[in-house]
Amino acid sequence: MKHRIVTAAQMKEIEQAGDAHGLPYLQMMENAGLAAYAELQKQFPHPGRLLVVCGKGNNGGDGFVIARAAAKDGWNVTVLLAEGEPKTSDAIRNFERLHSLPVHICTDGSVLETQSFAAVVDALYGTGFHGELRPSGLATCGLIRHLHKGGAFVLAVDLPSGINTDTGEVADGAAHADLTVTFDSYKPLHIAKISAHLCGKIFCADIGIRDEWHPEF
């Protein structure tokens, strides 16, 4: 896998190319979630309490894959539906796969503020985020920062929530991470001076899109 830096729009084109070559979006989501979980496992040789903060889009879908893998491995998993149930088809399918597992589903982040977690997965907002955080996002990012300060290890899926992928602009109240797992290609925010330090260590995972499938930019 080549090291490359692409914008949010270019990443969409790359995913479209993967789908056109027979790698379905659902499989890319599975590969992304499992790759992120593998990096989390490296930090924790033994399972503990895990909070997976999921938005309603495909970033949240990656989070549901992580939650499923962790629950099967013996983690005590809580999923926070920060903005309600998922809205995209692939995220919905992965949310439904949690129903047969011992995963706690929570819709009110305020009840988690006094709880303790070994790790938090930030799967709230993905590469489509821009502008300012809405009140719900501000509250959820505040919860992530609060738990981080309390000692939880924070893994961000693609990027810490509240950062603009293409410019690195950081919204007031954005989340911070110890480790950011991005997929296929790095994004501008991962190297921008104003945002890179909020990502912690950055790892770019292969999700099955071959180099020769990539469009020329």
Task: List the predicted regions and their residue ranges.
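YjeF_N-associated NAD(P)HX repair module
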Residues: 2-9, 117-217
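Structural signal for hydrophobic packing residues in well-ordered secondary-structure cores
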Residues: 15-19, 40, 44, 102, ...
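Nucleotide and nucleotide-moiety/phosphate-recognizing core
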Residues: 37-126, 130-157
